[in-house]
Amino acid sequence: MKILVTGGAGFIGSAVVRHIINNTQDSVINVDKLTYAGNLESLTEIENNERYKFEHADICDSVAIANIFAHHQPDAIMHLAAESHVDRSITGPADFIETNIVGTYILLEEARKYWLALSEDRKGAFRFHHISTDEVYGDLPHPDEVSSDTILPLFTEQTSYSPSSPYSASKASSDHLVRAWRRTYGLPTIVTNCSNNYGPYHFPEKLIPLIILNAIAGKLLPVYGNGEQIRDWLYVEDHARALYEVVTKGVPGETYNIGGHNERKNIDVVKTICRILDELIADKPDGIENFEQLIRYVSDRPGHDLRYAIDASKIKQDLGWVPQETFETGITKTIHWYLNNKEWWQRVMDGSYAGERLGLVE
């Protein structure tokens, strides 16, 4: 099977590419624009594999995408290319509209044209797998808002959309486009919505890598608002396994939620990282006895969702997928990776981002 992966140099995309090349006999065509968050160094372990090809292209370039389809003749598309940071979407929403909505439209149209020209056998086996986020659903009641005997709801595949940020609104729009191309044109599409990912090769604008790297450097650890917001955490390699199961075994027209079964308050995530670093690093930065001393509460993100939590029972029942990592095992692996891969993240931090606060509304 030949799988075209968009955004394969990004955090989740590179995990998908590594999983396919390392654990299957399938081939990958990685199509990536290489924005600030795209990093081919995340793929050095597989870059010379004969089953891996890279195409430097923008999904908004219809001519380039059509040529790539014609040249490589993929059997499936896994669409991960996206602008994905909520804070950046607050200060610069235009890139999110362009890439996440217009780019998805162009990819759908070129995929539809390509698919229509395939033989009947190949047409029947073709898949367009759109990878999205649980943020399209909005937020859920927080345990502090309800009585202790209340059963807290989870996001299911039937949950209505109610996006809160420019990022989540752009992803919701792309989800609707994908489903429209399925219903209107018959394109065999599948949608997945995942919870918060973490793990190796994560660009340090996101909470977990930012906290790890700030702590190592002895910098303050910013926590938005009161830190009580709750997220479900999914180890990225578990997610990559799930996505491969979906593209190879999933049913066209279906949606699958993918979660880690690891609800944690943001402040508890930060304190867990501090505790593990305390155990691993004997020589602390000057002036501190433990890393929790670096925690500082800062102004909250505008429109910050209170709680995300996913019901992943459908993908377990239909495809047999369950996460292998608990939050404790996954976060320990993640911290060890950052401690042992200083060259990777130092080169990232020497580029366009140095850990500054993003997403403030003037």
From Swiss-Prot:
NAD(+) binds at residues 11-12, 32-35, 58-59, 80-84, 99, 167-171, 197. This is dTDP-glucose 4,6-dehydratase. Coiled coil: none annotated. The active site is at residues 134-135, 167. It comes from the Bacteria. The keyword NAD applies. GO terms for biological process: nucleotide-sugar metabolic process; O antigen biosynthetic process. PANTHER family: DTDP-D-GLUCOSE 4,6-DEHYDRATASE-RELATED. CDD domains: dTDP_GD_SDR_e. The gene is rmlB. It catalyses: dTDP-alpha-D-glucose = dTDP-4-dehydro-6-deoxy-alpha-D-glucose + H2O.
